[in-house]
């Protein structure tokens, strides 16, 4: 409401200054605002919407520089790292070209499909890439997605995660990277069209088509279905790089059936699963194999770059444990270093851990669980012992959970408590 003093003089509705105290007083329906308050409001709005530094795609590192950075964190997978480095470099070159060039030639987007067994580094590769490029990055799980109108997440929620990670800066989010994990789980359940609606398989593939290709999508800022009257955020997905990853368990059999020369009888060679090199088989993959697996042709067409990853052998897993900048062994060394204790893993111990991960078929992802199990008792006892200088984990420690301890000079060795022998029963004496 308009404010008046005793002499009926007009006053600013915001700061309360009278008409005589300001240069200008602007009237609205029942309210007044002075020039000083207008200037203050203008400054507040300018600070609120101050432009954030944009991604300088012009100064993007070269493919060799991208690969060198990936080498510091990711062990092996040389072909995959090369392919990803080139694909990402070309993607941001394309953005730069389309923004600055008025040429008739418009460069089209090339999304990426990563294939490889579980625990081979698909997700980690995408995370490391986004960290190096300093662009907004989001990871989505394809298993939670359903068609619009059914229980589950809409495909637009993937874009919402990217916008949130860009602090709701839509322009910055439009140059980000989205990694969709478990993409093989939305494959069609059968090769033939079904009479029942496949809302979490083919239906999701159909819903993802326009987003992958490039469209202006309407994203609900509060997550969609529970708030139907909210205002939508408009985001253009044309310059968003989509990387889809999946294990595609069983596609190797489809490839083998296509490439193998069929032999039957005594001359037929039979290979066990352990003898097969899954990585070598996946390198022969063709779009037709993905079609048989359950991806629809339109979806395959929007993922033109197919990158295959090899399963990690014992040697590679040993390197994963010790070589990268954030290697698992280095993490535990740092944890014990905080207790002023040195930690050392012998080569035999690292090989035994790698062998256990292979037997569990968990790849690099399962290494932490194995090491955590070995280190549990060590990390429980060491903080309360001031006489221990160094802990050595050997191959024998993997089974016994008892490491070799190097004590401070002058400290007395403390033996581990021995298990009490069970008293012999009458039956044991008679059998003896």
Curated annotation (Swiss-Prot):
Region (Disordered), start-end ranges: 411-432
Provide the Gene Ontology terms for cellular component. Answer: HslUV protease complex
Chain positions recorded as Zn(2+) binding sites: 12, 15, 34, 37
**Residues annotated as binding ATP:** 117-124
Ranges where the ClpX-type ZB domain occurs: 1-53
Q: Which UniProt keywords apply?
A: ATP-binding, Chaperone, Metal-binding, Nucleotide-binding, Zinc
Quaternary structure?
Answer: Component of the ClpX-ClpP complex. Forms a hexameric ring that, in the presence of ATP, binds to fourteen ClpP subunits assembled into a disk-like structure with a central cavity, resembling the structure of eukaryotic proteasomes.
Provide the protein name: ATP-dependent Clp protease ATP-binding subunit ClpX
Please name the source species: Clostridium acetobutylicum (strain ATCC 824 / DSM 792 / JCM 1419 / IAM 19013 / LMG 5710 / NBRC 13948 / NRRL B-527 / VKM B-1787 / 2291 / W)
What is the organism lineage in this UniProt record? Bacteria, Bacillati, Bacillota, Clostridia, Eubacteriales
């Amino acid at each position: 409401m308009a404010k008046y003093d005793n002499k009926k003089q007009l006053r600013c509705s915001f700061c309360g200054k009278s008409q005589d105290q300001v240069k200008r007083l602007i009237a609205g329906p029942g309210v007044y605002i002075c020039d000083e308050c207008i200037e203050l409001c203008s400054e507040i709005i300018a600070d609120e919407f101050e432009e954030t530094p944009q991604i300088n795609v012009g100064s993007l590192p070269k493919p060799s520089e991208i690969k060198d950075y990936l080498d510091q964190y990711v062990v092996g997978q040389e072909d995959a790292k090369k392919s990803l480095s080139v694909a990402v470099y070309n993607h941001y070159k394309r953005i730069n070209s389309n923004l600055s060039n008025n040429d008739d030639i418009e460069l089209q987007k090339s999304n990426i499909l990563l294939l490889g067994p579980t625990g081979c580094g698909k997700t980690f590769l995408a995370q490391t890439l986004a960290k190096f490029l300093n662009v907004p990055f989001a990871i989505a799980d394809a298993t939670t997605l359903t068609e619009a109108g059914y229980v589950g997440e809409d495909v637009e929620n993937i874009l919402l995660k990217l916008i949130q990670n860009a602090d709701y800066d839509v322009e910055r989010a439009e140059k980000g990277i989205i990694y969709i994990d478990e993409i093989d789980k939305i494959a069609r359940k059968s090769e033939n069209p079904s009479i029942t609606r496949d809302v979490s398989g083919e239906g999701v593939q159909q819903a993802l088509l326009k987003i992958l290709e490039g469209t202006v999508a309407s994203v609900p800022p509060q997550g969609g279905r529970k708030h139907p009257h909210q205002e939508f955020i408009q985001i253009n997905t044309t310059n968003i790089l989509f990387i889809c990853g999946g294990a595609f368990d069983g596609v190797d059999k489809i490839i083998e059936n296509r490439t193998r020369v069929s032999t039957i009888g005594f001359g037929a060679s039979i290979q066990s699963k352990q003898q097969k090199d899954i990585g070598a088989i996946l390198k022969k993959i063709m779009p037709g194999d993905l079609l048989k697996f359950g991806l629809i042709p339109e979806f395959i067409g929007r993922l033109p770059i197919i990158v295959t990853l090899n399963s990690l052998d014992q040697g590679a897993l040993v390197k994963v444990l010790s070589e990268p900048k954030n290697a698992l062994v280095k993490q535990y060394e740092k944890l014990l270093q905080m207790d002023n204790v040195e930690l050392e893993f012998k080569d035999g111990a690292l090989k035994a851990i790698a062998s256990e991960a292979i037997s569990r078929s968990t790849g690099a992802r399962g290494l932490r669980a194995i090491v955590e199990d070995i280190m549990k008792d060590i990390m429980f006892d060491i903080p309360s012992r001031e006489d221990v200088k160094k802990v050595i984990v050997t191959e024998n420690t993997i089974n016994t959970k008892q490491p070799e301890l190097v004590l401070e000079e002058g400290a007395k060795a403390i033996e581990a408590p021995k298990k009490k022998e069970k008293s012999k029963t009458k039956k044991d004496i008679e059998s003896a």
